[in-house]
Amino acid sequence: MDIDPYKEFGATVELLSFLPSDFFPSVRDLLDTASALYREALESPEHCSPNHTALRQAILCWGELMTLASWVGNNLEDPASREQVVNYVNTNMGLKIRQLLWFHISCLTFGRETVLEYLVSFGVWIRTPPAYRPPNAPILSTLPETAVVRRRGRSPRRRTPSPRRRRSQSPRRRRSQSPASQC
């Protein structure tokens, strides 16, 4: 199966691969960030958003992977084999988890559209030959934040903007007042 964990969010594995591996913070830093910003929503039995669900699943997968890695590390007697397992997990699996955590934390913090715009901007920047691109890459934190903090409980009322009334280009007409309306 060819499963792309970003597809339902409008991104792709390829789009995230434009960001260099050293761009993503450590798993520990990302877990601390997720906990500090979204602990209540992540631990809640209520469904908050698809990003919360994906973030929750990535955190659980990382925990299971660490349990497996610890078990393998404790049961492999050959130090070279143990080192290979640790390096593989940190290099390959760790990068995928760091990308997932970063993507969903960023979507919750900045908004999905802003993150997608950033990924496309960075992808264009990195593929442009150095002589023709600005010296600095786009920075996500300089884009406007769109995060909305919601309280648990009732979902907020959605308000649609009222349509703007078009003003006539002709001068305003005054209503003539009838004698009966001058009470």
Swiss-Prot record:
Sequence repeats lie at residues 155-161, 162-169, 170-177. Phosphorylated by host SRPK1, SRPK2, and maybe protein kinase C or GAPDH. Phosphorylation is critical for pregenomic RNA packaging. Protein kinase C phosphorylation is stimulated by HBx protein and may play a role in transport of the viral genome to the nucleus at the late step during the viral replication cycle. A motif (Bipartite nuclear localization signal) lies at residues 158-175. Residues 143-183 are annotated as: Disordered. Residues 177-183 are annotated as: RNA binding. Keywords: Capsid protein, Cytoplasmic inwards viral transport, DNA-binding, Host cytoplasm, Host-virus interaction, Microtubular inwards viral transport, Phosphoprotein, Repeat, RNA-binding, T=4 icosahedral capsid protein, Viral penetration into host nucleus, Virion, Virus entry into host cell. One of its GO terms (cellular component) is host cell. One of its GO terms (molecular function) is structural molecule activity. The modification Phosphoserine is found at residues 155, 162, 170. Belongs to the orthohepadnavirus core antigen family. This is Capsid protein. It comes from Gorilla hepatitis B virus (isolate Cameroon/gor97) (HBVgor).
